[in-house]
Amino acid sequence: MAENKIPPDAPPLVGVIDPDPVARNGLRALLHRNGVDVSTFDSAESYLLAANGRHLACLIVDLLLPGMSGLELLRRLRSSGNDVPVVLLADESDVSTAVAAMREGATDFIEKPYHDVAVLKQVEKLIRRPPAAASA
């Protein structure tokens, strides 16, 4: 079973997966300004290649990714025993897919265009979870 325990002395690390560099860098800047370390990826595949062994507080994933979709990534994570909290970013037209993803283990979804406050509140809630709830 994959582990996702956050070391108690480590700053929270959030993964952001978005194919749009403006959106990806905007989320990184927003979270970084608020004391969160961020690793960014342009695809699910690049995340899977680079993230082996990283301790993530949560993942923020665009639902529509090139190659493997956000939903496919979620399924892959869950089937491998990794229950890192996943927040999906979904356009209004993708809300029904995002709701289906919640049934498959997504923690939440945020509709795009999103407000910074909504993202910060969700990340804050996830990185402050007790260790037992945040572990894989």
Enumerate the language-model features and the residues they cover.
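Acidic, metal-coordinating helix/loop segments flanking the phosphotransfer/catalytic sites
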Residues: 40-58
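C-terminal output helix
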Residues: 94-96, 110, 114-124
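His-Asp phosphorelay/catalytic-motif detector in bacterial-type signaling
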Residues: 11, 55-57, 79-85
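Acidic catalytic/metal-coordinating carboxylates
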Residues: 43, 69-72
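Short amphipathic alpha-helix used as the core "switch/output" element in two-component signaling
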Residues: 71-82, 100
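Non-catalytic signal-transmission and effector/linker regions of two-component phosphorelay proteins
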Residues: 1-28, 43, 127-128, 132-136
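Active-site residues of response regulator receiver
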Residues: 61-63, 90
